[in-house]
């Protein structure tokens, strides 16, 4: 069905987006098996080898059922910026097409998805000493205080960021200090890195709130049962910089407290469940307001869709692949 000789600009690209625990991976796997596809990760935590369980990466069985790419490819000591991910994704899409397979992006990291569909503005390299200053201030003062400093230099950007969002606060601070321009100004410049080549079809999963919250709670319990605490103990033993993305993944700070003996397991799990629900809510809001889907699946979680509903999705995709109509 996928012509490896087709022009990259006209070749189909399926994008499946949605909040955590909504069933994205299950749908992507189904599409990959039915349409000879490769599932390509668009989740900023699932790129790390250290977090198979806590990032809800596809299981070994799922990875054996269909090809997957960009899952567990980076060490936790690294940072996977949007630009770096976009370059990796571009290579993965090209490799899928060269093999005659359908590339299927799957994830909930909004900035990754937006870059894939719209491209990425160019932000110049910040001088190492300015970057070091931002990291030192973050370590010494904490994210909330650095957020206040950012507001003095770039109020508009500060208003977009939560005071606890350490990584993005430090990035915004170093850009405005190093370039004299807000990161928002750089984003508004003409695109320097193009979107992923192809004819995209965007499916968004937007399940009912109650079902989403229940799925988040159940997933966290399943992670703990599957060995999340053992996985986390290995990560903490590495003594990585607490500001690294892998150390701030949803569930990591909350469950780490029980490993340090600060709270009991039940309280840590409850806190991690709450963090997961809040994260899913933010993801859903961002996706609804920032992306332009070709189809929204809002009836239920993917895992609760009937076979007839799933078949309808298959037919929708089949029509797109044959004609380009959505």
From Swiss-Prot:
Belongs to the IPP transferase family. ATP binds at residues 18-25. Substrate binds at residues 20-25. Gene3D superfamilies: 1.10.20.140, P-loop containing nucleotide triphosphate hydrolases (3.40.50.300). This is tRNA dimethylallyltransferase. GO terms for molecular function: ATP binding; tRNA dimethylallyltransferase activity. SUPFAM superfamilies: P-loop containing nucleoside triphosphate hydrolases. Catalyzes the transfer of a dimethylallyl group onto the adenine at position 37 in tRNAs that read codons beginning with uridine, leading to the formation of N6-(dimethylallyl)adenosine (i(6)A).
């Amino acid at each position: 069905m996928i012509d490896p000789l087709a022009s990259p600009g006209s070749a189909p690209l399926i994008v499946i987006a949605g909040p955590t625990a909504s069933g994205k991976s299950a749908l992507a796997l189904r599409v990959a098996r039915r349409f000879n596809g490769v599932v390509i990760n668009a989740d900023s935590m699932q790129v790390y080898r250290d977090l198979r369980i806590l990032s809800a990466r596809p299981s070994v069985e799922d990875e054996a059922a269909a090809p997957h790419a960009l899952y567990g490819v980076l060490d936790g000591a690294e940072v996977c910026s949007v630009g770096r991910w976009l370059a990796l994704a571009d290579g993965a899409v090209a490799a899928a097409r060269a093999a005659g397979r359908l590339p299927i992006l799957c994830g909930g990291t909004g900035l990754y998805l937006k870059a894939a569909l719209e491209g990425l503005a160019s932000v110049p390299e910040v001088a190492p000493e300015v970057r070091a200053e931002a990291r030192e201030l973050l370590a010494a003062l904490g994210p909330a205080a650095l957020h206040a400093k950012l507001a003095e230099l770039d109020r508009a950007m500060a208003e977009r960021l939560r005071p606890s969002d350490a990584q993005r606060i430090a990035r915004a601070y170093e850009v405005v200090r190093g370039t004299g321009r807000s990161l928002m100004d750089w984003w508004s410049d003409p695109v320097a890195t193009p979107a992923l080549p192809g004819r995209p079809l965007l499916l968004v999963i937007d399940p009912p709130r109650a079902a989403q919250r229940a799925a988040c709670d159940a997933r966290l319990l399943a992670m703990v049962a599957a060995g999340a605490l053992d996985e986390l103990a290995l990560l903490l033993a590495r003594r990585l910089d607490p500001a690294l993305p892998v150390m701030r993944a949803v569930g990591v700070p909350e469950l780490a407290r029980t490993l340090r003996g600060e709270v009991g397991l039940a309280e840590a799990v409850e806190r991690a469940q709450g963090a997961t629900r809040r994260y899913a809510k933010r993801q859903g809001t961002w996706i609804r307001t920032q992306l332009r889907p070709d189809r929204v699946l809002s009836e239920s979680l993917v895992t609760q869709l009937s076979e007839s509903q799933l078949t309808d999705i298959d037919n929708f995709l089949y029509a797109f692949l044959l004609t380009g109509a959505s």
